């Protein structure tokens, strides 16, 4: 749960750092860095999943605001967030990736009883089996307004390109969390194998148990080293998604 908070802040910060206007950088980055605001990533839609080129949520310009219409799902920490990095289709005549724009959409922070008090949006929590610290939500937008100044970079149609530039860092951070979860599972399993007694000895001595633990150690080490390698590549300005 705590690690996932960092991922959303990282995505928002990289989007603004690399794609935002100077005014957007000055306004948002200090608040994200200090923890004054909590961002959330609002990309995924029902029946769309990772196919972001098929995003159907629309953001239509109306004077000094964009009016957002559509549905999003699997939005992490959405209720308590203060700002949404919102991917929406600003040009409905352009299909695929070209008609997408990224918005820095402000919203009031919600509560358990009233997760989305902002006008033009509603939603509810999605029950999950694991990762209980990560609260997931589905959101419906019905005329939700975003200021035109909150269009990332000030130009429409760059949303997909801007988003792809951030995913490397987010995936490295997610990989690091996965390695940590796996390491903890391994240590719990190893301790249980040492403490659990059967047939006059610890079950860790049984070949089947020892073999499973050994493969866990090998695969965790591989994942950890690959994560470190990707992080080094990113730090050195090289591609790290290959």
Predicted features and spans:
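Extended, low-aromatic, Leu/Ala- and acidic/polar-enriched alpha-helical coiled-coil segments
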Residues: 176, 207-217
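C-terminal helix-coil-helix/basic helical segment that borders enzyme active sites and/or dimer interfaces
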Residues: 190-204, 217-242
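FAD-binding core of flavoproteins
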Residues: 3, 24, 30-187, 191, ...
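Short, flexible active-site-proximal loops enriched in glycine and acidic residues
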Residues: 1-8
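Hydrophobic alpha-helical transmembrane segments of multi-pass small-molecule transporters/permeases
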Residues: 11, 171, 209-212
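Well-ordered alpha-helical segments within folded domains of soluble proteins
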Residues: 8-14
